[in-house]
């Protein structure tokens, strides 16, 4: 099969036989966009090559994105000196694509109009090599100039009316088709020239995926050959043609990734292709890239700082310990695109700290080689200097988390909650609850639910993981039977991986309920009564922290399930909705019912908590302290309290725990700031003393304990395998480092 023509056989193999079969024959099914996760590399890609040895070495990355008029104006010596000053051991440098920053010999590869006889890319590469740095070349293929459009009009993206697409920001440029010959042939030649001439360690491509839908002749022909369909005329993901197109798009990008990687390795065996973002994480799991970078440069709008750490967890869920870098911007990252701006020091520091605490290696990105605002330079220097001095404690070998939150790309792709709010709100609410409860946790990907992976954890959490396959349900069921804990909410397992509604929950036996097929809501002014066990006269452990509460607020959407056991515990029961206006009518029509709103059970050797309502989503919306207590109690009970570390003290602190070759670390990120939910931070505000109690890895003993940020040796108490460390204060990020013997 040629690199440029993905035929029907390859399409079916890549996206999965069952799903593709529903997409290629013109039959309408319940499958929606991107529902299929790859489980093995397609045969036409071949076995994945080993990771080049250099990939795991760099710990601090520097990226200089040149602009076209930089040649002859920017000071390359300054940047090389700055890379050295910040202890950067790898660089990503602009090379080609839209603009060539070297004397390219490829026709239509636009040389910078300011290039002259210079070679700024080559100068930077040589300077970095002299400093012992790894170097990857940045290319950007998403736009081209008039000469390209005239010579090869078929390389340009076409809109639904058959018109070539101008660039949305710079109308002098044209948007290229990412899935046709421009990438598969022209950019392949560009990459080959760069690697051949400069012997770089890899190619990193920005905006390599389609920037918009394309109706060019290549997309029409290749999509028809792969799927038997015409291009979709709608963006509605429920449309079968649209679903087929999205599956084909993913397959085509995977083919392009494999092509570029193989071609680069043929030129230089120790080099590789690194996409700036895979088609999805399931594809990254199959393609096994030797290194990946999370391009989540800063927060915008209503975004908490833990968002950077979340992106780290997402990549770690599929990277199997291979390195993950975190790209961060030194500017203001908002939709208005102030690319020459400078962000506050406090904001940059906390953003990078949260990524570091979650196992990302920092990568600063600077646009334009000519500096117009130098305020960020000492900020990055301070961050990188700290990182360099403590590198051996940041080269992690394993997460020590005992809780995992399920990452379900299937649910995101195929499921729309009844609230019509983003399905991600459920995950965000659960994520925030775990962070606020100071629970160290990982993300585990739905395509990787093997016993080996699941059994690392005492608990797996399903935050409305609505779309799960039978095999995924079986894996979770077996995990619980082996002794694992499970916390699940709302519609978890109600649909299969294609988004088709099941007659009953896929995990009904674990939840202890039967699906009635209904959903109630949106509810207003509904409540939950906290009940004692009539046999013991005490409340269930999941209600810990709510001792003085007779009732708490309910959610907005609930499933009226039928219990499988009449004598199951009933810690929470329904108080049905009643009027909230006029005020004279605001009284409950039923003070209490026996309708259970949480199901707790101990099937096999495991423990299960199931909330048949949207507790996680509502928590994200209103941040009720009572809902936080419910979620924290469920996690604590279902996990049997197993945790590598317990941290007590004032403030909102994110906690992570890691193992290194001869040490372990506990990261404490201080999120206690009035700008925590809406940046940028104005200043860092210290919080008071924290008590850290941790369990040493089996067969080890602590030889030294250090607080890396304060540079002090804390008061420490040993009790067998347990260690208690007193941390006097945290400004933004403290790391408890324990040397082991």
Describe the role of every protein-language-model region.
Residues 2-19:
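N-terminal secretory signal peptides and thylakoid transit peptides that target proteins
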Residues 4-5, 25-54:
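C-terminal segment of N-terminal export signals and the immediately downstream linker at the start
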Residues 47-49, 135, 238, 242-243, ...:
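Carbohydrate-binding surfaces of carbohydrate-active enzymes
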Residues 61, 90-93, 123-166, 272:
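Glycine-rich, aromatic-flanked loop segments that form ligand/cofactor-binding clefts
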Residues 68-86, 109-131, 255, 425, ...:
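Aromatic- and glycine-enriched glycan-recognition loops and surfaces
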Residues 86-119, 144-155, 284-291:
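Aromatic-lined carbohydrate-binding/catalytic grooves of carbohydrate-active enzymes
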Residues 141-198, 233-246:
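Active-site-adjacent "subsite" loops/lids of carbohydrate-active enzymes
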Residues 182-277, 282-283:
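Active-site neighborhood of glycoside hydrolase catalytic domains
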